[in-house]
Amino acid sequence: MKIRTLSGSVLEPPSAVRATPGTSMLKLEPGGSTIPKIPFIRPSFPGPAELAEDFVQIAQANWYTNFGPNERRFARALRDYLGPHLHVATLANGTLALLAALHVSFGAGTRDRYLLMPSFTFVGVAQAALWTGYRPWFIDIDANTWQPCVHSARAVIERFRDRIAGILLANVFGVGNPQISVWEELAAEWELPIVLDSAAGFGSTYADGERLGGRGACEIFSFHATKPFAVGEGGALVSRDPRLVEHAYKFQNFGLVQTRESIQLGMNGKLSEISAAIGLRQLVGLDRRLASRRKVLECYRTGMADAGVRFQDNANVASLCFASACCTSADHKAAVLGSLRRHAIEARDYYNPPQHRHPYFVTNAELVESTDLAVTADICSRIVSLPVHDHMAPDDVARVVAAVQEAEVRGE
């Protein structure tokens, strides 16, 4: 994929040494040796010289934000990557992209109706619903895919259709939902708009080979520094409907049109020129970096085949912010996390707690409704999230595998 700078030169693949955080060390025992810590996330960015070159060009153009040439070029490049039938609005971050998606798809709510959504996702999803005037109605997840459960949603819709404004579907962990077509059929049957939060999924594909971005009314992405495709802070709203994307552009600029008159509710959500410039560089060589992340997952699957962990369906074609796996029990999960800590490997257990267990929603329970979330509770009790990096060192991959295997062998 060829991308040009403001001066017209073609961007080359990023330098071999990309900007990454420093390495910390862990002392294994008093007076003992130390080993480098394997971080959970290792952001990969263009080097200082490349960033300086971009900033010099921005300064010379004296255009730092407000839909400058880098932002326009970046939006076109995103569309070229995702598919020419799609339309893209860039935004300052993924949360603003989600707010824009809800506003332009469902309209401004008055907190008297609900959006169906999984509890098993990042807490910003339910917060976005509240900010746009809707209440969360939490549904359960599928035990095999860990994605939102169609049957759980249908049970709510059949009883409470008049209270439901739409569906806010998460592609959990940025992995394309294998049942996306079934969800779209459900939404069409009940005449409900459906928005997809694909925050960590830029570069992922659905099971049919289609890249994430073109399903439902729209999909959103986050380009946060922790994501496989990152600019620091940034996001995008993607849709097949150009009118919806145009509304999103107005929403992120106070509802202004060319006459400088505001014709709709809006806010400031514009992507800066330096973030767009970083995004242009990050697109160069992206597929190679994502392939290297999928290779890590393949090594994990092979190496942990007898370790009692099961990885997520369809993750082999995802961009892989990290690798999620389910242990056999809560005790096994505790053993795996303990073994990883002893081996100086950072890990997490996303999404634990799920949204409905966060203190804000426990304290303000009147704001939400919920189905039975038995599967959500079970998966949360057994989930572990393992580190995945661009071009992860084979020795680091082997250390992660050995640590998980050790937990199974020790039977802690």
From Swiss-Prot:
<feature type="modified residue" description="N6-(pyridoxal phosphate)lysine">
    <location>
        <position position="227"/>
    </location>
</feature>
<dbReference type="InterPro" id="IPR000653">
    <property type="entry name" value="DegT/StrS_aminotransferase"/>
</dbReference>
<dbReference type="GO" id="GO:0010106">
    <property type="term" value="P:cellular response to iron ion starvation"/>
</dbReference>
<dbReference type="GO" id="GO:0000271">
    <property type="term" value="P:polysaccharide biosynthetic process"/>
</dbReference>
<dbReference type="InterPro" id="IPR015421">
    <property type="entry name" value="PyrdxlP-dep_Trfase_major"/>
</dbReference>
<keyword id="KW-0663">Pyridoxal phosphate</keyword>
<dbReference type="GO" id="GO:0044847">
    <property type="term" value="P:iron acquisition from host"/>
</dbReference>
<dbReference type="Pfam" id="PF01041">
    <property type="entry name" value="DegT_DnrJ_EryC1"/>
</dbReference>
<comment type="similarity">
    <text>Belongs to the DegT/DnrJ/EryC1 family.</text>
</comment>
<dbReference type="InterPro" id="IPR015424">
    <property type="entry name" value="PyrdxlP-dep_Trfase"/>
</dbReference>
<protein>
    <recommendedName>
        <fullName>Protein Rv3402c</fullName>
    </recommendedName>
</protein>
<dbReference type="GO" id="GO:0005576">
    <property type="term" value="C:extracellular region"/>
</dbReference>
<dbReference type="GO" id="GO:0030170">
    <property type="term" value="F:pyridoxal phosphate binding"/>
</dbReference>
<dbReference type="GO" id="GO:0008483">
    <property type="term" value="F:transaminase activity"/>
</dbReference>
